[in-house]
Regions:
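Short linear motifs at secondary-structure transitions and domain/linker junctions
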Residues: 3-8, 60-62, 83
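Short, compact, well-ordered microdomains
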Residues: 67-107
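Acidic, aromatic-enriched beta-alpha/helix-loop junctions
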Residues: 25-71
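Short, solvent-exposed coil/turn segments at beta-strand boundaries
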Residues: 20-26, 75
Length: 107
């Protein structure tokens, strides 16, 4: 079951949006700066795995500079984090598309 949710990182002043896979790991992640609503991350596990398996460190570095770094590890306990709430698939897709456009990539 795919779960989509958001939390708030008080230290970084970021809204974090996750689409978690069946194992509870981030499949896609969007980070939006709270102060100005600017997207700063829009990373995808499938893209990261593809680069890891078929490209070099330079390509991976370029991806991370453009789209940010995907969270590693299970996202257990997100429900107790600040600002935690489930988000709809539609809301996540809207945020994903907006973030990818802002960061210069395909939706």
């Amino acid at each position: 079951v795919t779960v989509r949710f958001r939390t708030y990182d008080e230290d970084e002043d970021l809204w974090l949006y996750f689409e978690a896979d069946d194992e509870g790991w981030a499949a896609r992640q969007v980070e939006i700066r709270a102060a100005d609503s600017r997207p700063v991350t829009a990373a995808c596990l499938a893209e990261v795995v593809h680069l890891r398996d078929h490209a070099d460190l330079t390509a991976m570095g370029g991806y991370e500079r453009r789209y940010g770094v995907l969270a590693e590890g299970p996202l257990d306990g997100w429900e107790t984090r600040p600002g935690a709430a489930e988000v709809s698939a539609e809301e996540f897709e809207r945020l994903w598309a907006r973030a990818r456009r802002a960061l210069g990539g395909p939706d």
